[in-house]
C-alpha cells in the first residue's frame, strides 16, 4: 500500500495535499485497490460548496459505486476533467494523475482533524 507521508487522510479513504491556501483531494491507493477497475468518476462543478464528511461525488468500478466524502469544507476551485475520459488514472496514479478536486477551505484548521499517513495505515490494518 502506497501512503505518501506528506499527505493527510480521512477515515473514508480520501487524501489531502495542502498547496498554499488550497487543498488537492483524491482517493487513496488502498481505496482504489479495494474498488477494482474504475470505469467512471462523477465530480462536482467548479464553484460548488462541499461540506466535511458529506458526499461530493462518486466513483464507479466494475464491482460497485462508491461515494466520495469531503475531508474538509470549502469551495471547489478546480476539477480534474481528465478523469472524464481517463477514469483508469484512479487505479494507475491515485496520488498524481488522479487528483479529483482542488478546494479553497473555509477553515484550514480542519486539516488537523485528518489522519497522518501512520494513523491511516494503522486504521487500514485494523480493518
Swiss-Prot record:
Family in the record? Belongs to the GcvH family.
**UniProt keyword Zinc present:** no
Q: Return the Pfam families for the record.
A: GCV_H
Function in brief: The glycine cleavage system catalyzes the degradation of glycine. The H protein shuttles the methylamine group of glycine from the P protein to the T protein. Is also involved in protein lipoylation via its role as an octanoyl/lipoyl carrier protein intermediate.
Transmembrane spans: none
User: Which Gene3D superfamilies does the annotation name?
Assistant: 2.40.50.100
Tell me the GO BP annotations in alphabetical order: glycine decarboxylation via glycine cleavage system
Q: Which CDD domains match?
A: GCS_H
Q: How does it assemble?
A: The glycine cleavage system is composed of four proteins: P, T, L and H.
Q: Which branch of life, at top level? A: Bacteria
Q: Lipoyl-binding domain: from which residue to which, for each copy?
A: 22-104
InterPro entries in the cross-refs: 2-oxoA_DH_lipoyl-BS, Biotin_lipoyl, GCV_H, GCV_H/Fam206, GCV_H_sub, Single_hybrid_motif
The keyword Ion transport is assigned to this record? no
Q: What is this protein called?
A: Glycine cleavage system H protein
Where in the sequence is N6-lipoyllysine found? 63
Q: Which organism is it from?
A: Geobacillus sp. (strain WCH70)
Needs which cofactor?
(R)-lipoate
Gene Ontology cellular-component terms for this entry are: cytosol; glycine cleavage complex
